[in-house]
UniProtKB/Swiss-Prot annotation:
Region (Disordered): 1-24
Any single biological process term in GO: translation
The protein's name in its UniProt record: Large ribosomal subunit protein bL28
Gene3D superfamilies recorded: Ribosomal protein L28/L24
Transmembrane regions: none
Superkingdom of the source species: Bacteria
Protein family: Belongs to the bacterial ribosomal protein bL28 family.
GO cellular component: cytosolic large ribosomal subunit
Gene: rpmB
Organism: Aeromonas salmonicida (strain A449)
Keyword Nucleotide-binding (UniProt): no
Length: 78
């Protein structure tokens, strides 16, 4: 399963670790993803989404049914 938020599209980013001597080594910054079940009142069922913390805030603000409608319109099977 890829490390991509289904709501925001956040993906791993690439950057550098920096030591005290300022040596650079490559690293990945991973998004804060969680598999979370959301209750969809209109469908009377739970829907599992892999979302970041920011994605959960978006769902809290706009509502799960609005976000699901946008996901389905973009071709995501939910």
């Amino acid at each position: 399963m890829s490390r991509v938020c289904q709501v925001t599209g956040k993906r791993p980013a690439v950057g550098n670790n920096r030591s005290h001597a300022n040596n650079a080594t490559k690293r990945r910054f991973l998004p804060n993803l969680h598999t979370h079940r959301f209750w969809v009142e209109g469908e009377k069922r739970f829907v599992s989404l892999r979302v970041s913390a920011k994605g959960m805030r978006i769902i809290d603000k706009r509502g799960v049914e609005v976000v699901l409608a946008e996901l389905r319109a973009s071709g995501v099977k939910v």
